[in-house]
Each structure stands twice: as structure tokens, then as C-alpha cells.
């Protein structure tokens, strides 16, 4: 092990070994050590010109939605309902018709402006101890 470089290669190479590109273990390490700890460029602001315009993308294994909220601010949220994990917005890009993301599965509703859970349509009464502020899209 003493003869390894800081990136674990035995010597300087023109290209990385193929397992660096195809091995699942390297991919998982990169997700944890690189992609989850740094800012990531997702798009130019010009792609979200109108209020309520959005785009969806994947970063690693996370499905993300970027939206210009009703106040004109850009927001990024997990594009996954906190109830049963359904994708909130299937389209790649577009303009929302309202200021609310509604899950197609059980109609949980989230604010486009804040990501906060607004309404739980599948329950007439919330269970004891259920805290809406703990199940936002953030």
C-alpha cells in the first residue's frame, strides 16, 4: 500500500482503469465523497424564465425538481413525495398550473414556494404525533 498514489493508482497513467468507470463500488464512493458534498451546476437561470417554470433532473440517485416559485426565487426540492415515494412531477420541464405540487398517488400537497407539506388528503384526521413540518420536500 505504501507505493500507491493519493488516488490509489500504482503509477501515473494516461487513463484510469476501466473499473473506475464501471464498478458499482467506485460509483457509490463518488456519490458519497464528491457529488453529495459539493455544489452542482444544474442549469442556466434562463431555462426558468417564468414564475412556476420548472425542470426535473437526477443527481446521482436523487430525483430533483428546480422551480422558479411564485415570488420569482429559484428553489430546488426532492421530486419525491414523502408519503410513499411517488415522483411528484413526471415531466422534464414546463410551467406549473398552481403554486402547489400534488402527489399523484395519495394527493399530498406541497408548497412550491417553501417545499412545506400543506395538505394530507388521504387522512381525514392526522395521526397523533404527526408533524407536517418534518415531512417537507427539503
Where are the model-predicted features located?
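Rieske [2Fe-2S] iron-sulfur-binding domain
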Residues: 48-138
Amino acid at each position: 500500500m505504501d507505493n500507491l498514489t493519493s488516488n490509489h493508482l500504482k503509477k501515473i497513467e494516461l487513463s484510469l482503469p476501466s473499473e473506475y468507470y464501471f464498478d458499482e463500488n467506485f460509483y457509490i464512493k463518488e456519490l458519497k465523497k464528491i457529488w453529495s458534498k459539493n455544489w452542482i451546476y444544474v442549469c442556466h437561470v434562463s431555462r426558468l424564465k417564468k414564475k412556476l417554470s420548472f425542470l426535473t433532473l437526477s443527481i446521482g440517485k436523487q430525483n430533483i425538481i428546480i422551480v422558479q416559485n411564485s415570488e420569482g426565487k429559484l428553489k430546488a426540492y426532492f421530486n419525491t413525495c414523502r408519503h410513499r415515494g411517488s415522483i411528484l412531477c413526471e415531466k422534464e420541464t414546463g410551467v406549473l398550473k398552481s403554486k402547489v405540487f400534488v402527489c399523484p398517488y395519495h394527493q399530498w400537497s406541497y408548497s412550491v414556494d417553501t417545499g412545506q407539506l400543506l395538505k394530507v388528503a388521504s387522512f381525514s384526521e392526522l395521526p397523533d404525533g404527526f408533524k407536517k413540518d418534518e415531512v417537507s420536500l427539503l
